């Protein structure tokens, strides 16, 4: 957490969606709080979050993003992260794997501010697959507002709508091997022969599945390439 800032400052707002404030984690988002979609109109809803003289926030909903006040919201750094590596063997077989995990962190989807404007500026851009779940008729329950191509009321980029969890569990590495028995290798004058298969980034269980949870740079995602999934096969021979 931040314990002091330069001079007499108690907070500094950086870029469009970060705040440095005494008492808060260093990488804290500062955004207008998205409250879902109005089932009757399909418009985005926001909490006003205006502060009264006692410091209480007004949690009234509004469809006008300009009436909403940005507030500190979530943090980039996970509360818990780590990994587990295990090596198992039985007779001629061996198995090694590494799991990595992260819990409690968030990222800002900067790419989303370009491709999720609900029709305001998507004319020449690809849409994310989850736009298929957008609001389409009264009564629809979804968190994707209605799509109106060429709409004039552009979506606010500095909204918690674009803040997503980076919670995940990943099978980072896996190697499975088989060592030929000595009574086989002795016949061909070899000391050891091991055949193995290896892979990396094979499986990922993530709370937010639209981009890789390890991709964010300094809490932001902007078209970065995710870690590659790789496979390899090999033979080890000792004479």
Please place each PLM-identified region on the residue numbering:
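Surface-exposed, extracytoplasmic segments of Gram-negative outer-membrane nutrient-acquisition systems
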Residues: 1-77, 85, 94-165
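Generic recognition of flexible, low-complexity loop/linker segments
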Residues: 72-73, 82-85, 183-184, 221-222
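Membrane-interface anchoring segments and C-terminal beta-barrel signals
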Residues: 3-8, 134-239
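Surface-exposed extracellular loop regions of Gram-negative outer-membrane beta-barrel proteins
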Residues: 80-95, 180-182, 236-239
